[in-house]
């Protein structure tokens, strides 16, 4: 082929040639797993590797539905990639930020080719072959450019695909549906339909749940019922939004440059058919069950919640089913956030239509690999363990930590009256009061709204610092709220890390508590940098904060608080551009949300939800964010240390134990 000549070629991520079903199934059978269970695990993980299926089986060892033949649902979508996808994702973010979430945000940008249908686990590879056959058949006529025309109504905004390109795409969908029906064949399938058993309710959550909550039906399938889309082909931008947002959404949509090059990919996805009408939650924090009927949570876990079955859940709790384990139980709602519907879908295979220019100029090996159906997403895993470790270590990270226990948390707002003499001197009325207080220029009264750590709070902070030392984490810089309890916590953590002399604490008023929650009509009087240095805190006096202390306004609005935290996080991250270690931020419980969401590219949550979430954050609660340079975003990951859990210790009066009383 002459240099510069353009040829249409296809790339299909098909495992039939290089990795047949037996090669994936045999290792699982050799370990003693039943055939139907192994096939279920392979289908649930997209039939990628036996290792992933094995991990799924281990996670689901206590899943009450593990042995039930519940098939996955599958759908075929035409998805944009490249520059056009980036612009569409930008629209997704901006429309959500400016106009709130709507139904379109539940799924990634796509054109539906075939609605969801079921397929038996042992016949999933038939769908892969159907996708390949349909793609190969329409390869020569597939449009090199798909024209998109903007359409808007009072509740819908999207791009329509029409004309001859739409006809070819419909033919592709019809061919896939026909091939899938032929290859899947005829079978008798046993389906399990979810139904509530009268008189039992959610009490069945941990005792043979599936047998109690699912009713089996036998259905004769003459073919795999795949229905190609017969409606106007469309790529939805917004759906079921508020009418007053229509104009803003249209302006954002018109800003999408449709001239960008795009590779269109036909992607086959699956989902769990039982949870189609459930809400999907994503765990933000780790949670260790306190009772047998509670779920274990790890950050990133997805939980399916049926809003109609929450009668027995206490306020602040929900009943859900973990996608990772299949187990059902209670979980604290404020440990989670709403996730998108498609976050739990599994991508199986894709057929990509691309324009390749000057293929002859490529190396032979490169060209052949792109045309031979290699599963390209797996190439990212080909790094050696050493390279992968180096890549992980090199990532910039932010660890946000709430301060330790405050004195006023235990002894109430009148704590200062309990530990001060009439002439203003401090004494220790209880062992949980600190041994001493630092000197303040205006005397002890300024501690009332800027309380110190309790003795237990000091102990908590040291435990956390010691655990961070054991984890091997490398702290490169430390930022703290100007509240005394936060600066104390930062100092104690650094002492346990043996870094108190090497790293100075940068005091950042921009991450101080939401001032609306502070007592009084003025902001509390906080210790100056000079007072902190006199009290033996290693303070960086050269640091110029994003928000000076004098700029803190009393009773600020929720939006003002969020804007303040966002601006502070921008400066904090940019202040350490060369550091690849961990940025430690010691602040208040509220900042675990207000300082991480800007990094994650998430808008502020509703004010009421924010207050509910913050109320449950314990002392030394942590959120850990890592920068993913490959994808150009930050991610919430497991904190480097475990949580600190302990119970209350009530006051004791020995006089109550005098004999006879």
Swiss-Prot record:
Q: What is its main location?
A: cytoplasm
Q: Report residue spans for region: Phosphatase-like.
A: 395-661
Residue ranges the record marks as coiled coil? none
Q: Which UniProt keywords apply?
A: Cytoplasm, Nucleus, SH3 domain
Which cysteines does the record link by disulfide bonds?
none
> Which SUPFAM superfamilies does the entry link to?
Phosphoglycerate mutase-like, SH3-domain, UBA-like
Summed up, the tissue specificity of this protein is: Highest expression of UBASH3A in tissues belonging to the immune system, including spleen, peripheral blood leukocytes, thymus and bone marrow.
Q: Which residues form the UBA domain?
A: 15-60
Quaternary organization = Homodimer or homooligomer. Interacts with CBL. Part of a complex containing CBL and activated EGFR. Interacts with ubiquitin and with mono-ubiquitinated proteins. Interacts with dynamin.
| Protein name, UniProt field | Ubiquitin-associated and SH3 domain-containing protein A
Supply the source organism for this entry.
Answer: Homo sapiens
